[in-house]
Amino acid sequence: MGCTVSAEDKAAAERSKMIDKNLREDGEKAAREVKLLLLGAGESGKSTIVKQMKIIHEDGYSEEECRQYRAVVYSNTIQSIMAIVKAMGNLQIDFADPQRADDARQLFALSCAAEEQGMLPEDLSGVIRRLWADHGVQACFGRSREYQLNDSAAYYLNDLERIAQSDYIPTQQDVLRTRVKTTGIVETHFTFKDLHFKMFDVGGQRSERKKWIHCFEGVTAIIFCVALSAYDLVLAEDEEMNRMHESMKLFDSICNNKWFTDTSIILFLNKKDLFEEKITQSPLTICFPEYTGANKYDEAASYIQSKFEDLNKRKDTKEIYTHFTCATDTKNVQFVFDAVTDVIIKNNLKDCGLF
């Protein structure tokens, strides 16, 4: 009897080859689909990272889209100066020029209608300009850790002349600096290095967290954002709770969650620019009384990094990938995200048995 291969055997071998090919293709397709979850406490920079993805990977904001942010820029600017002026009363700081008290009254009288209309009328921009130039207002701004103030306050107020122009169109940087509280889940899609990313930005305030849970299934990596500059601030929603401590508590619960045993965890220690400005004026012992190092950027930032990384209870099997970031700096985010993507590619290929 010869060793001829029957037609059935040949067909079976072909089928088997085809199944293997399909499995491999499915594996490669799965390895190319990346589900990224952006987590972190409120105001840690998650939404700014999402905006950067649009700028870096999707041609940025069109002129029309930038125009739509004009009302948000005005609202952020008005809210910022109002927060400072209100805080002056609580902190018992007087205006350097008593005439500014009239401007403060004007500010509160005009701001409501301006915000509703998404405008910055000339009389209101004049009021804001005079208030912002007052030494008493500047002294109060210098104590902003004692009340709630947007990070972008000085950015907009210092540039009032430009944004108050009647033909003003926000720049990409203006858009990046806007602050709108994220409620619910914002999903962004983009392609980079032959990977198809789905990025989910989840509201960070406590009231938002119960909405996170169903997002977790099948997630490739978590980017956890921490505002380095929040070490001397309290929460907007709980004035007893230090923001950095809240962030550590949340990171602990995410990093050691049984659901995320196989999920890459990437830690963005964000707002490094604000932290560098602040650390020489406001000691780290406000947040960590046991800290004995210098109030210098490198030493203090390394200490915070070790505090977060030490929360990882599975150091032997789980690595935390830490990066220092400035979410409003496009080049920095581009550089960091490139490194993050390489880690994801490597881990993905490993999971699919292709590495």
UniProtKB/Swiss-Prot annotation:
Disulphide-bridged cysteine pairs: none
Broad class of where this protein is predominantly found: cytoplasm
Keyword Transcription tagged: no
Gene Ontology BP terms: adenylate cyclase-activating G protein-coupled receptor signaling pathway; adenylate cyclase-inhibiting G protein-coupled receptor signaling pathway; cell division; cell population proliferation; G protein-coupled acetylcholine receptor signaling pathway; G protein-coupled adenosine receptor signaling pathway; G protein-coupled receptor signaling pathway; gamma-aminobutyric acid signaling pathway
Binding site for GTP: 40-47, 176-182, 201-205, 270-273, 327
SMART domains, per database record: G_alpha
GO CC term (a single one): centrosome
G5 motif: region residues: 325-330
Superkingdom of origin: Eukaryota
Function comment: Guanine nucleotide-binding proteins (G proteins) are involved as modulators or transducers in various transmembrane signaling systems. The G(i) proteins are involved in hormonal regulation of adenylate cyclase: they inhibit the cyclase in response to beta-adrenergic stimuli. May play a role in cell division.
Sequence similarity: Belongs to the G-alpha family. G(i/o/t/z) subfamily.
PANTHER family: GTP-BINDING PROTEIN ALPHA SUBUNIT, GUANINE NUCLEOTIDE-BINDING PROTEIN G(I) SUBUNIT ALPHA-2
The protein, known as: Guanine nucleotide-binding protein G(i) subunit alpha-2
Species of origin: Rattus norvegicus (Rat)
Gene name tied to this protein: Gnai2
